[in-house]
Amino acid sequence: MQTYTGIIKTPLDAIILFEACRIGLLPRVQRRLSDHERSLIRAGSVFVWDEREAGMRRWTDGKSWSASRVSGSFLTYREMEGKRKPYHHGLSTDGSLKRSPSADTTGNSSLNAYSNEDSGAASLSDEESVDDENLRGLHYKPNGLIKQSFSITTSLNHKLHLISYSSPIPDPSLVTPSSDVNLSRITIPYGLYPDAGPPLVQAPKFLAPYDILVEKVACSEDARVLDKLRQALWL
């Protein structure tokens, strides 16, 4: 069920995996994970799913997570020890009205929630905010996982989600999709991922460094230009 093993650092990394799944190079998640599959989640585990294809909007991994934090285009969570208390709408024990999910600047419901069974991807709007009472007794898990979520809607109205797991201690054996030689030939179709914005996809074809033929370099000046171009493409 796992889509990829590696590290996701940028939206481009996520989009490369979306495209690899679209063309059949990598598998998409088709259903919720079983208990056994949840137990196999490790640093480097990456999961991609199509909301309509898998029939699910929210990710289920059975772990407890901290409040979400916005990190660029991603939402980031830290693994917690223990389980949060169930959240209920309506009146609290003293008869006062319980706090309902608050709207964030994007118009989605607040994603700052401790997520036990369901932790959503960045585009989801049905996460529940949690009262301070529910946060008591929860602590960051020593050497616990870090989870990132990323979502995008394609021009064909496919809602795609990505969940990745990493460790606070970097693993040098894990690479990003954008630096993975096995994915270096993937091209991003122009206009398919409009939410990615102009900085990510500006031309009909994503130019990988391997598309540049070294044997066509005519002189040392050309070589210097080529090196600069390659460095820019890897950023």
Curated annotation (Swiss-Prot):
**Gene Ontology BP terms:** meiotic cell cycle; negative regulation of conjugation with cellular fusion; signal transduction
Q: Name one GO cellular component term.
A: cytosol
At the top level of its lineage, which domain of life is listed? Eukaryota
Please list the residue ranges that the record marks as compositionally biased, kind Polar residues.
102-118
Give the residue ranges for region: Disordered.
Answer: 85-128
> What does the sequence similarity comment in the record state about its family?
To yeast YEL007w and to the N-terminal of S.pombe gti1.
Keyword terms of this UniProt record: Cell cycle, Meiosis
Q: Enumerate the InterPro entries for this protein.
A: Gti1/Pac2
Query: What is the name of this protein?
Result: cAMP-independent regulatory protein pac2
Write out the function statement from the record: Controls the onset of sexual development, by inhibiting the expression of ste11, in a pathway that is independent of the cAMP cascade.
